[in-house]
A protein has these predicted regions:
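C-terminal hydrophobic helical "lid"/dimerization subdomain
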Residues: 1, 262-322
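Short amphipathic alpha-helix with an adjacent loop that forms part of the alpha/beta core around
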Residues: 187-196
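A glycine-/small-residue-rich N-terminal strand-loop-strand element
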Residues: 44, 61-85
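Mid-domain Rossmann-like dinucleotide-binding core that forms the NAD(H)/NADP(H) cofactor-binding site
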Residues: 114-186
Length: 322
């Protein structure tokens, strides 16, 4: 098969590799589209220390081509949205069967865009923060895939007010279409909130943003940290101070959950996929790239100039075999 590898010189190349075969409990997916996500920037930057050359890509859509021992052979040919441990930028990728989710009639570009972001947003709102009826929610990185989905899930959970924070006027304008009551610019946070306090804050940024977010929590409020895009200093929280106001600092790590409790992640993903298929939420695929432009796509994501979800066209795009 042909695959895109990230080589030791930080360039992406299309190369020929042996086609992987599924082991017990696994399926092989013939990839149609692959999602582009923040993990791809972390691989490029060496934050995920993987040996190179490495086939990146953590989100895929396509059809099941083969199954391993213990997997129903009736799944062969099934269209899926797959949460992948790596290797999605290839013609075929092997994935745990439990994390290859039946996509039904969801279009394959959208199924790739579903990726890790949709179940992450679902769990941030419903599992970690447990957003309740009438509660207020503040969402950082509001124009990203997780941010736009978290706003939609918060509305479905009954949130009374949803406020976002975005990095530019264009991104703020884009985010506004996903259920936010207000979207601030990053430079306006937190002053632009005045005295407003929130029951829930969702923060993938870290650093100063996380410190200020703790300060805008209402009594009994919950801040859920699920990333550190800022890469700044660790944020220290005084447990006794939090205790006196009933506030909580929580974390969420979908990647870890996929390794420790994959069925839990799959359950959330199936529920989220059902909401997508039913038209109750939308995954907004705003850009499709060809393999030759993968470096550009990852760079744009890193620079914060994208919004919504970007996907890579894979099927029929990796060239002919020699």
């Amino acid at each position: 098969m042909r695959a895109i590898v990230l080589d030791v010189d930080d360039t992406y190349r299309v190369t020929e590799l042996d086609e992987p075969a599924p082991g017990p409990g696994e399926v092989a997916v013939r990839v149609a589209y692959a999602g582009i996500q923040w993990g791809d920037t972390m691989v490029e930057d060496g934050i995920f220390p993987v040996p190179r050359p490495f086939v990146p890509g953590f989100e895929a859509s396509g059809h099941i081509a083969a199954v391993g021992a213990g997997v129903d052979e009736g799944r062969i040919g099934e269209p899926v949205a797959a949460l992948v441990p790596g290797g999605a930028f290839a013609e075929v990728v092997v994935v745990p069967a439990v994390l290859a989710l039946a996509a039904g009639d969801v279009p394959l570009p959208v199924a790739a865009g579903f990726g890790w972001g949709t179940p992450t947003a679902y769990d941030l709102v419903n599992t970690a923060a447990r957003v309740g009826e009438g509660e207020s929610v503040l969402i950082h990185a509001a124009a990203g895939a997780v941010g736009t989905l978290a706003a939609q899930f918060a509305r479905l959970a009954g949130a009374g007010r949803v406020v976002g924070v975005a990095g530019s006027p264009a991104r703020a304008g884009y985010a506004a279409a996903f259920g936010f009551d207000q979207v601030l610019l990053r430079g306006e946070f937190p002053a632009g909130l005045g005295a407003e306090r929130f029951d829930v804050v969702l923060d993938p940024v870290g650093g100063r943003t996380r410190r200020e977010s703790l300060r805008v929590l209402a009594p009994h409020g919950r801040l859920v940290a699920y990333g550190s895009i800022d890469g700044g200093e660790p944020v220290l929280a005084d447990a006794d101070e939090l205790l006196m106001s009933g506030r909580s600092l929580l974390t969420w790590n979908s990647n870890l959950l996929s390794r420790t409790h994959p069925e839990r992640l799959a359950g959330s993903a199936r529920r989220a996929l059902g909401l997508l298929a039913g038209g109750l939420i939308r995954v907004d695929v705003t850009a499709e790239y060809d393999p030759a432009d993968l470096g550009l796509a990852v760079g744009r994501l890193r620079a914060g100039v994208t919004h919504g979800k970007s996907v890579l066209r894979v099927a029929g795009r990796l060239g002919s075999r020699p």
